[in-house]
Amino acid sequence: MKYVSLDSDEKILSFISSLNQSSPIAVDLEGEFNLHIYGEHLCLIQIFDGKDFYIIDPRSKAVSEKAVVAFFTSDIQKVWFDVQSDNSLIFKVYGITINNVFDVRALAKALGFMGNLISLEEEFLKLNKDSVDKKKLQQTNWLKRPLTDEQIEYALSDVEYLLELK
């Protein structure tokens, strides 16, 4: 998948200001949760605006905490699947909560659907994804750079259909 790397504060802030406040974006995170190193760390932010994919690497020296916080606290609606653990990570790392979130998982649960994102996409969008590969990549080392093409494909696939599920 092609994507735009928002690899500087200037690009992140420009991206935020370019978004239409009435159009939601799909967002997800990859983090490290005591699997490869002690502690919890934000490793990647992936975004889909319905047309293009974007990646923010918060581990990059060119990306400041201020720019990442500006993204999460912006008024743009962020469509997520199961934001609870990601919001907890953001609070632990930055001391903030994510603003203006629509949680697809909360909606699915309210409608009686208890499955994960893959099963939700299969059920409602008739997609067929290989959950074995997804499971393997969930536990990859997201702190290690450079990220592989496989890791990036995995990360972007988590936001690809969220806007449709909303």
Which residue ranges define each predicted feature?
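An N-terminal domain-cap segment
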Residues: 21-22, 26-27, 32-40, 56, ...
